[in-house]
Regions:
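Intrinsically disordered, low-complexity regulatory segments enriched in Ser/Thr/Pro
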Residues: 1-21, 65-114
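Short, surface-exposed, polar/charged, turn-prone segments marking secondary-structure boundaries
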Residues: 33-37, 83-87, 139-141
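Low-complexity, flexible helical/coil segments
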Residues: 43-45, 91-96, 121-125, 146-148
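Negatively charged, low-complexity tracts enriched in Asp/Glu with abundant Ser/Thr
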Residues: 2-66
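Short, highly charged C-terminal tails/helix-capping segments
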Residues: 135-148
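Ampiphathic alpha-helical segments that act as solvent-exposed interaction surfaces
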Residues: 26-31, 101-138
Length: 148
């Protein structure tokens, strides 16, 4: 079974170094930890502490790839909103100079304004090693943004 390092930062942790490094867990244990967090309560704490951050960081023990889900306290909607950041690299060709030259652009998988269900689904993809699914979703969102 694959193992993952888990680090949780609550609003009362003033700096990134204060986050709780909880150790190595299997996939199901990580999902249980994610479900056990009262995200609404974390949101209220974040707002009370003005600028505090709640994050859930998972690192693959083998590849050292990392995925961080952060709760966005200042979302425009009433629903919980998450931001996903990762070090999952994507290299995309980018046409330049009247379409004659193709350059490669390096980017990292990241999403904003994710619902709780979307955040959990992306976490599940990461834990299952389905990085191509994350990359494809990121690319499709980027394409939609370019067309808009």
């Amino acid at each position: 079974m694959k193992k993952f390092e888990l680090e949780i930062r609550h609003p009362q942790h003033l700096s990134e170094q204060d986050a709780e490094a909880l150790g190595l867990f299997e996939r199901t244990e990580i999902l249980s930890q994610f479900d056990a967090i009262n995200w609404r309560r974390q949101l209220v704490s974040q707002l009370e502490m003005n600028g505090a951050i709640t994050s859930f960081t998972v690192t693959d023990a083998d590849t050292q790839q990392c995925l961080r889900l952060s709760l966005n306290a200042y979302s425009a909607s009433d629903q919980l909103a998450f931001k996903l950041e990762s070090d999952i690299e994507i290299v995309t060709p980018q046409k330049n100079l009247f379409g004659l030259i193709t350059l490669k652009h390096k980017d990292y998988v990241a999403f904003k304004q994710l619902s709780l269900d979307q955040a959990k689904a992306y976490l599940n993809h990461f834990l299952n090693g389905q990085l191509d699914t994350l990359k494809d979703n990121y690319k499709s969102i980027r394409e939609k943004q370019k067309q808009a």
